[in-house]
Structures are given as structure tokens and as C-alpha cells.
Curated annotation (Swiss-Prot):
<feature type="zinc finger region" description="C2H2-type 1">
    <location>
        <begin position="1"/>
        <end position="4"/>
    </location>
</feature>
<keyword id="KW-0479">Metal-binding</keyword>
<protein>
    <recommendedName>
        <fullName>Escargot/snail protein homolog</fullName>
    </recommendedName>
</protein>
<keyword id="KW-0863">Zinc-finger</keyword>
<dbReference type="Pfam" id="PF00096">
    <property type="entry name" value="zf-C2H2"/>
</dbReference>
<dbReference type="GO" id="GO:0005634">
    <property type="term" value="C:nucleus"/>
</dbReference>
<dbReference type="GO" id="GO:0008270">
    <property type="term" value="F:zinc ion binding"/>
</dbReference>
<feature type="zinc finger region" description="C2H2-type 2">
    <location>
        <begin position="8"/>
        <end position="30"/>
    </location>
</feature>
<dbReference type="InterPro" id="IPR013087">
    <property type="entry name" value="Znf_C2H2_type"/>
</dbReference>
<dbReference type="GO" id="GO:0000978">
    <property type="term" value="F:RNA polymerase II cis-regulatory region sequence-specific DNA binding"/>
</dbReference>
<dbReference type="GO" id="GO:0000981">
    <property type="term" value="F:DNA-binding transcription factor activity, RNA polymerase II-specific"/>
</dbReference>
<dbReference type="InterPro" id="IPR050527">
    <property type="entry name" value="Snail/Krueppel_Znf"/>
</dbReference>
<comment type="similarity">
    <text>Belongs to the snail C2H2-type zinc-finger protein family.</text>
</comment>
<feature type="zinc finger region" description="C2H2-type 3">
    <location>
        <begin position="36"/>
        <end position="46"/>
    </location>
</feature>
<keyword id="KW-0862">Zinc</keyword>
<dbReference type="InterPro" id="IPR036236">
    <property type="entry name" value="Znf_C2H2_sf"/>
</dbReference>
<keyword id="KW-0677">Repeat</keyword>
Amino acid sequence: IRTHTLPCKCHICGKAFSRPWLLQGHIRMHTGEKPFNCQHCQRAFA
């Protein structure tokens, strides 16, 4: 039983999320965006 709504929907695959920041991280999976870099090894992360 769901107790919350899922107002944030991915325009690419239709998956729904309860929070905008969860949707933002999910969209990065589709786009391949990796905005965070390690200061030690320069590896990029989503």
C-alpha cells in the first residue's frame, strides 16, 4: 500500500518519483551526465 503520491515523472521512460531530486538522479542515468568529480583521482560520478 502506497502512502504517498509520485508527482515527479520521467519524461523519457515514465518512471515516477516522490521527490524532484530522485527524478534528477534518475534522468542522469538516461543522459550519462556525471557532474561530480573526485578531487583525488578525477573520476566522474552521477
